Amino acid sequence: EEIANGKWPLEGAEREAWKSHPKLGAEYLRTSYHFPAVVSAGVMMHHEWYNGEGYPIGKSGDDIPLYARIIKVTDSYDAMISKRPGREQLSPADAIEYMMAMAGAEFAPKLVNIFLRRMAVYPIGCEVLLSNGQHCGEEF
């Protein structure tokens, strides 16, 4: 938590400590809560990239467990639209645009397509300006 809420970008030992969180999380789920191996493997590999550039192992494509590929898509979207140290918060539309651009590199293309078909571009509660100049949203 101290690293997550600290100064970003991380360097040196802090960066390496942060990169160990998938393995630590998977081990915690396995030993403390007896989650099935398929779940803990998904947690451990949720920072793997579809093209093999991720961590902690460097797996690619369908060698990355399905749970990990799903967590990668959903966790990345949440991270992009949330306020986090060291990165700009994106609008849902910008996050979706990024995910579409990175499908096949960072993300599994089929899972991005499934996620985006089920995801609203304008989540509940956001303000939308209509072409006639009217505002729509929860507050209006």
Give names to the regions the model predicted.
Residues 1-140:
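Histidine- and acidic-residue-rich, metal-dependent catalytic cores
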